[in-house]
Regions:
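Short hinge/gating elements
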Residues: 1, 17-21, 66, 94-98, ...
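Solvent-exposed alpha-helical segments within well-ordered globular domains of core cellular machineries
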Residues: 1-4, 13-16, 34, 65, ...
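Walker B motif beta-strand of ABC-family P-loop ATPases
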Residues: 156
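Conserved P-loop
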Residues: 75-153, 200-202
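Interdomain "pre-motor" coupling segment immediately N-terminal to P-loop NTPase/helicase cores
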Residues: 4, 8-60
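AAA+ P-loop ATPase motor domain of ring mechanoenzymes
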Residues: 37-87, 229-242
């Protein structure tokens, strides 16, 4: 009862079991207590990571394990392990991923995000347009400051496809406000199909565009995702597999038909 009140349920569940082990192995009371506390700490860590994973909205399939590292540009491949360690988050730095559609920008950003969560960080993945609408709604309801404070609780926010956002002035302003609020304090990971020279299509106003870029690149790691389209290559592989399956099926059907014909002829001959 007291352990539940103290919010230490893991110790309560394992106390008797660990006591028996301690008696068998001749532990001191200090060893017994340290072991119980370590179980409680580990269980809390596990639950915290599960909670952070749920709230992150990270696509479950875009992890480091499913990332084809052989396809990554060498500079990206060299920096990936360091980024996954999360040092850039501690320094409030940003990660900017540029490249044409289908080059794996989102997968790399999400893989980094999953690793950060695994290391105890709070991460939020969101399409840029969704974040903009969220902030715009908060502004209309006069709670933008509260919404920004809530987002400030995340160690890293992944803004996916910033290049697809064609904003009104109000939308541009809330996005700029969000980026300015996190400047030099909290990390942002951004994927974009547009190079910086084309960002005037996002922010419209040249001065706002320059100010946004300046804040993002001041402390940033820039990853250029070159090479072929991952999606196009996967589509080509799927087509090849479908053709191979069709060919195999056709061959099997022909063989079965030939066997059936031969059997029928043999039976007629016997008659």
């Amino acid at each position: 009862m007291m352990l539940r009140a103290l919010k230490m349920p893991t110790i309560g569940r394992h106390a008797e079991e660990v006591a028996q082990k301690a008696e068998r192995e001749g532990w001191t009371f200090g060893q017994y207590l340290r072991h119980l506390v370590s179980l409680e700490v580990e269980e809390r860590r596990r639950r915290r990571i599960e909670r952070h994973q749920r709230e992150s909205n990270l696509p479950g399939e875009k992890t480091l394990a499913t990332l084809n590292r052989k396809r990554l540009p060498p500079p990206v491949s060299r920096q990936l392990a360091t980024l996954c360690e999360g040092g850039f988050v501690e320094r409030g730095e940003n990660v900017l991923l540029f490249g044409l559609p289908g080059r794996g920008k989102t997968h790399v950003a999400c893989a980094i995000g999953h690793e950060l969560v695994r290391r105890g960080r709070r991460v939020l993945f969101t399409p840029t347009y969704a974040l903009v609408q969220r902030l715009l709604g908060a502004k209309r309801e006069l709670r933008l400051e509260k919404e920004l404070a809530e987002l400030d609780g995340f160690d890293a926010v992944i803004l996916d496809d910033i290049g697809y956002v064609q904003q009104s002035r109000d939308e541009m302003e809330v996005l700029f406000t969000f980026l300015a609020e996190r400047y030099e304090r909290k990390s942002v990971l951004i994927t974009s199909n547009l190079v910086f020279s084309e960002w005037n299509r996002i922010f419209k106003d040249p001065m706002t565009t320059a100010a946004a870029i300046d804040r993002l690149i001041h402390h940033a790691v820039i990853l250029e995702m070159t090479g072929g389209s991952v999606r196009a290559e996967r589509a080509e592989e799927t087509i090849k597999e479908a053709r191979a399956t069709t060919t195999t099926t056709a061959t099997t059907t022909t063989t079965v038909a030939a066997t059936t014909t031969a059997t029928s002829e043999d039976q007629l001959g016997e008659m």
